[in-house]
Structures are given as C-alpha cells and as structure tokens.
C-alpha cells in the first residue's frame, strides 16, 4: 500500500528490492554509488509524493514507446490506470514488460527511481487499488480507466543528489 513515509512494510520491501537489484547489477553500480541511493524510507516517501511516472514499453513492431502515467503501489506491484485505446495496452500484450521512470529536479537537486518488470493488462482491479489511485489523483474519478496495467518489479534503482537528500557536499 502506498500511504505514507511511515509505511514500514512498503519501505522494507522497496529497500530489499533495491538491494537485490544492485547485487545483480553490473555497470549501473558505478553510475549509482551507494551514497547516492535512497534508503527504503526515502523511496517510500518519494514514491508517495510523486504521482506520475514515464512508462516505457515496446510496440508490437519492436519500436519503443513512452508516455506519462498516474501510478499507485499495492501488494508489491505498480498499478497504472489506462484508457482502453492506449497504445501501451497493445504493447504490453505483445511484450509483457514495462519500465517506469519517476524523476524530479535538475542538476544538484535531481532524484530518480527506475524500476522494471513483467506487466499484464487487467480489466478489473482490487477496490483498494482503485481507491488508493483515486486519492493519488486528488480525488478525481477513474471512470475513464477501462483497463489497468500491473507491473511486478524485478529491478529497482534509485539515485539522489546530495542536495536533494539535504546533505552538504562537505559533510
């Protein structure tokens, strides 16, 4: 459940997922040094605050596709409400994999979470997913969401510049 920074279960899961991802990573470990990675609680807080991600998928013909999307986290998966005519539905049906990029800031204050995993198209979702996502949509109705994507992350990486973390470079 994506509720607040205080959600210890979410923070623990995100921390474990990131640790496992970095333990299997190659060159990305150099690009994302340990002191620049978010902690589990930082990840939970960041993802609670950021309501939109850039979803990247592969079109049936192999070309890349990216589009912004509202997202929620529930039951260790990312949930994306989607219009029935959205290109990403056909993309995920053809290539059941999705990558999400959640970024903010510029230069010394930027932060990013990158996650990816298998995805599936669903016509219905648990009531909790719908209500959580409506809250994240500032109470806006999700009647337009005729389909949903559920992505179960296999990898998650984060990066946060020191200024984003509130740390001075000399500390």
Regions found by a protein language model. Name each.
Residues 48-50, 64-66, 144-146, 152:
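Short gly/pro-enriched beta-turn/loop segments at secondary-structure junctions
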Residues 84-86, 96-101, 129-140:
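Short acidic (Asp/Glu) patches
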Residues 86-88, 165-166:
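Short, surface-exposed beta-strand-loop junctions and turns on beta-sheet-rich folds
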Residues 104-106:
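Short, charged beta-turn/beta-strand-edge "cap" motif at the junction between a beta-strand
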Residues 1-38, 108-171:
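Charged, gly/pro-rich active-site loop segments
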Residues 50-84, 100-102, 111-114:
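Short beta-strand segments
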Residues 26-59:
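Short, conserved active-site entrance elements at the starts or edges of catalytic domains
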């Amino acid at each position: 459940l994506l509720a607040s920074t205080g959600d210890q279960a979410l923070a623990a899961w995100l921390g474990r997922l990131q640790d496992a991802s970095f333990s299997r990573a190659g060159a990305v470990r150099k690009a994302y040094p340990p002191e620049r990675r978010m902690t589990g609680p930082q990840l939970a807080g960041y993802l609670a605050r950021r309501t939109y991600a850039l979803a990247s998928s592969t079109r049936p013909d192999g070309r890349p596709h990216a589009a912004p999307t509202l997202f929620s986290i529930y039951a260790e998966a990312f949930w994306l409400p989607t219009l029935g005519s959205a290109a990403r539905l056909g993309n995920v049906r053809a290539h059941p994999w999705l990558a999400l990029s959640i970024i903010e800031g510029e230069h010394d204050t930027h932060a990013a979470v990158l996650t990816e995993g298998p995805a599936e198209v669903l016509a219905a979702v648990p009531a909790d997913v719908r209500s959580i996502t409506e809250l994240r949509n500032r109470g806006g109705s999700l009647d337009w969401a005729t389909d949903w994507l559920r992505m179960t992350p296999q990898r998650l990486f984060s990066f946060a510049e020191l200024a984003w973390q509130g740390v001075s470079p000399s500390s």
